């Protein structure tokens, strides 16, 4: 079983950071927008004696091990489904710049959940996928659906907004910056 998933980058058109939550995160209100810059995942799954996850890709800037959010997403999917063991291989064709604030890792993790769900004939509902997304990060719920949406809470509350075409230019400085909300 094999599938290829297109994972779009996203930008924040607006961002309002509100009070701190009991869980240590901040409440946000943000209009997020997917853009036409993509990573691509090639996901394959074959029956095996035990579950095994292997990551590979074209970038030297990301880890291909358990520290990668894609790996964590695959593990979370396995833990929340009652599937027989498989060897899961995920190739990450990285085009979204790393550490650019464009949700490259988040969109790849959301794409992993979506792709595995597709390969295994949708054992999880969209609501269940969103619950897994929320466990992995604040912008994964948006990345699962994309488009233009108002996000609230920690990023788990989504409201679709009308889309108006716009042209943008993105500039990434040479020095990486980690985005933290």
Question: What do the PLM-derived regions correspond to, one by one?
Answer:
Residues 2-6, 14-30, 122-181:
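ATP-dependent small-molecule kinase catalytic core of the GHMP/sugar-kinase superfamily
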């Amino acid at each position: 079983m094999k599938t290829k998933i297109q994972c779009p980058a996203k930008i924040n058109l607006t961002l309002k950071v509100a009070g701190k939550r009991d869980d240590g995160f901040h409440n946000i209100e943000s209009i997020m927008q997917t853009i036409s810059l993509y990573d691509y995942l090639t996901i394959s799954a074959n029956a095996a004696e035990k579950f095994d996850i292997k990551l590979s890709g074209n970038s030297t800037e990301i880890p291909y091990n358990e520290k990668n959010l894609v790996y964590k997403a695959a593990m979370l999917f396995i833990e929340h489904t009652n599937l027989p063991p498989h060897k899961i291989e995920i190739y990450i064709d990285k085009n979204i710049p790393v550490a650019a604030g464009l949700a490259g890792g988040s969109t790849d993790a959301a794409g992993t959940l979506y792709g595995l769900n597709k390969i295994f004939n949708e054992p999880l509902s969209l609501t269940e996928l969103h619950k897994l997304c929320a466990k992995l990060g604040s912008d994964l719920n948006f990345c699962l659906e994309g488009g233009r949406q108002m996000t609230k809470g920690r990023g788990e509350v989504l409201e679709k907004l009308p889309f108006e075409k716009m042209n943008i230019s993105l500039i990434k400085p040479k020095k990486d910056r980690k985005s933290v909300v």
